[in-house]
Amino acid sequence: PGGTVADMNTQSVGIVGVVNGQRLWIDGNADGRIYALKARTGEKVWEFHLSKRGINVSPVLDGDTVYAAHSEENIDSGIMGRVVAIDATGTGDVTATHERWRAEEMAVGFSSPLLHNGSLYVIDNSANLFSLDAATGAVQWDTSVGTVGKASPVWADGKLFITETNGNVRILQPGPNGATELDHDELQMRDEDRYAEVYGSFAVGYGRLYVTSEAGIYAIGASGTPFAARAGTAPDLGGEAAATSTPTVLQVVPAEVIASAGDSVEFEVRAYDAGGRFIGMQEASWTVEDLAGGSISANGVLTTAAGATNQAGTVTATVGGLSAVGQVRVYAPLPWSENFENGRPPQWIGGGGSLAVEEVDGNQVFRKGASRTGIHRHAIYMGPTSMSGYTVQADVFATQRGRRRPDIGLINSGYTMDLQGNRQKLMIQSWAAELRIQEEVEFPWEPNTWYTLKLRVDNEGDRAIVRAKVWPRDGAEPSDWTLTAEDPVPNRSGSPGIIGYSPIDIYFDNVS
């Protein structure tokens, strides 16, 4: 909702609460700011610029005070790290006006604060636990709970339950001047002589404590205690003021739709007042744009053309001087083909400014260039996630600059076919972060040459067979698959797509 992104990967989790009768969503963000948004409409209420880097710590709200922390460079000094208390009643940029207190040089970059009975407990990146006076920020006491602080402290049964990255699990009894250690264990790997890394916090429920580690999931509780899952009690978020009768914001619901050619979709319009409070449903006038053959009735029912091709457009609802838009993607039955002669397909999902259609050798092709942010890997999805039992194919072309060569590939049902430039290999993989399945084969290939890629996934009983094929575009398609992988825990469906790592230009054409 605001500034330039400083980090592309942050982990702050937002919270919801009521401040001054207004329901807010409060969150740390990738631009180093804490934002308060109207929870139902997303309108920004205030922002507080805390760090020059992204925020990973989740904020805590108590009444009209927000507690937040980070471990990077502060915006107003070279000091690293800070814990702050923010007056949550402001509007606009409250950085200079609504800070209640700060605790300097506390590198609390991952672990989120815990508030209990007037004390704010924080764990810094070196696993030092601090108890702060929540009203003033003064340090009441501190103690070491290990060497690497990632997880957050948890309060239960009058005690602090703390995990530390190097396998340490502690139960502490806090007091006014310190904490007494009641128990300390080190979780171990079962088949290796080392500790099991722990990144998650304790979870409390059903008379048990749950903790996850590299070695497994542990449930801690009295032996023989019966387990009975039951709904929890919703927290009291505070009293929200009554809505007025004057709309200031409209929402079209559903806001985004994937439809098949010939489908009908019902839309409704919701109205909210200046405080982001729900007023009610509204009767609206409707228009439809960029959906060939589509029409929408006076009561908001969109009908797509039975013979519609793949496309994307919008429906707009107007009430008085207000309007709101819903996005619609329409997909025809297979087969599909795309040669980019009409530009970038509007129904494709993903990508960014480094993607464009341009002319090469008299043909329109899809170019993916280097990213301005330095994040050169992009995946672009072409259809609904419910698709299965299909084959995806494309012509691809990769450039070279010095020793730098890109990767280029296809996506089918959550499986990626990756033609790797610097490694000169073809890989089939799923879940790139962990490479849940991975098969590869040596495959020398040349830059500045068009190749054809083909990826097919077959669900066979309780497994999936993934087949990939590569050949020079000007040559005949080989009868044998270049690489095959078997997945015993298969992805049953997923969108087709194209993918590439492109510090230099790559091109796609004739995608089908």
Where are these regions (language model features)?
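Extracytoplasmic beta-rich repeat domains
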Residues: 1-22, 29-30, 47-62, 69-80, ...
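Short, aromatic/His-centered strand-loop micro-motif at the edge of beta-sheets
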Residues: 432-454
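Extracellular glycan-recognition surfaces and repeat-rich motifs
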Residues: 344-376
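Short S/T/G/P-enriched beta-strand
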Residues: 230-274, 323-333
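Short, solvent-exposed beta-strand-to-loop segments that form ligand-recognition rims
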Residues: 469-495
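Extracellular carbohydrate-recognition regions
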Residues: 327-352
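Short tryptophan-centered beta-strand motifs in secreted/extracellular beta-sheet-rich domains
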Residues: 340, 392-394, 449-459, 466-470
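Secretory/extracellular carbohydrate-interaction modules
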Residues: 368-435
